[in-house]
């Protein structure tokens, strides 16, 4: 969301807004930046070995691949693509998390719903909740597939801001829902010393009615929202999961009213947090985190917060998962334009979901081109990531590859 829009949303309070109200605000803003017409009529010729960006991608059943905000893993000789099963109308989750399979990353078979919503009233994943950004990883120790995703409880808008866990013995499911929770309740970031903790405890988020001032930002950087949510746990919205070279897994999420990123270490079974975490870019308004590691260097690509509307991507780099993280210019470059002539400084009309690495000779930036009027018809964008002479990621538009 833009600064003005997000300010209005936050001042009202997530708990006071319905999902429809919040999504309507985002849709109104998005409509001023990009035209969302009816469903695209062109389809990508991916069945003959080409992926065409900015067009519908059909599975072998002839239907558009309805898997958004997710990721791809390889198990055996098969790739599995997980993502949000989005409705054609509305914004809540009515089905669950989709899964597709492929031998070549071109021809995709619809394997159905890997994790279904519950029909039980009061369940955390009751039909009508919001399930977003699902990420599935394989745990070599437990020999199970673990799914983490952003969960909002039914009827509570975006107030819950939880991370949820599920697991399965099979890559296509069914996944068993385990629980949902806030992140790292009652725990300080591991690198936050006693003095900084005392400073954070002197802040008062409820006292700030005037957002976005210099004084307010200073309070945010002191840890105002970290302290506000300290007892109940930190918020978790857009998220990803990263497994490092040593097998350690990390949860990276947009927290503190989408103002700050958190990176948290997961337990060996990937089903809980160890309690070790820290913050990235406090007050920076980053979401949709995507991460990769190249030659010992970590690269984190995020978007800004503009609802469904595209914006300029942000990039951070570090030599350790724990930082310090340095912000660099957006990796998206070039004069070519993407979907509906969106330029590089609008991420070619898309928002990142995952970086698929170790499959092709180059990492692939996976993204969604959102269509909030028909979310099920949101398009997929895959772009190869190059590296310049200094070893910095560079992403250019390509029509197909």
How should each PLM-predicted stretch be described?
Residues 24-401:
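Carbohydrate-active catalytic/glycan-binding domains of CAZyme proteins
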Residues 2-10:
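Bacterial N-terminal signal peptides that target proteins for export
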Residues 2, 17, 23-26:
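Position-driven detector of the extreme protein N-terminus
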Residues 6, 17, 62-63:
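Exposed boundary/loop context
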Residues 9-20:
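Bacterial N-terminal signal peptides
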